[in-house]
Amino acid sequence: MAVCIIDHDNIRGVIYFEPVHGKDKVLGSVIGLKSGTYNLIIHRYGDISRGCDSIGSPEIFIGNIFVNRYGVAYVYLDTDVNISTIIGKALSISKNNQRLACGVIGISYINEKIIHFLTINENGV
C-alpha cells in the first residue's frame, strides 16, 4: 500500500494506492479545488523542494478526478500501476498542463479501518 499527502496552498488531500477486492485501486479525497475535471499524474521525481516545479516530467497518467460544486473530489480509480515502482515519485493534480498541487508517494502501513471506509464509499454501504 502507498499513500500520497497533498498539501499545497488551499488544496489538501490523501490518495492511497492499494489492492481492493483483487484489483489495484487509487482511493482518497481532495478538497480545495474549483469544480471541474482534473488529472492525476505520476511524475519522475519525488523532489518537492521547489513545489511542483521540481517533480520532473510526467510519467504515468492515472486518471481524471471530478471536483463537485463544494470543492471536493472523491477518488476511486482502477489502475495498472505497480505500486513498488512509484514509491518516492510525485503525484500531481493538474489542469490544462498546469500543476496545481503535488505530493510524494510513500509506503504506508495497511490500516483496515481506512480500507473498510474506502470500500464502503465504493459500494455505497
Curated annotation (Swiss-Prot):
GO terms for biological process: superoxide metabolic process. Its main location: host cell. Keywords: Disulfide bond, Host cytoplasm. The keyword Disulfide bond applies. InterPro entries: SOD-like_Cu/Zn_dom_sf (IPR036423). Coiled coil: none annotated. The keyword Disulfide bond applies. It is found in: Host cytoplasm. Disulfide bonds join 52-102. GO terms for cellular component: host cell cytoplasm. Virion protein with no enzymatic activity. Belongs to the Cu-Zn superoxide dismutase family. This is Cu-Zn superoxide dismutase-like protein. It comes from Camelpox virus (strain CMS). The lineage of its organism: Viruses, Varidnaviria, Bamfordvirae, Nucleocytoviricota, Pokkesviricetes.
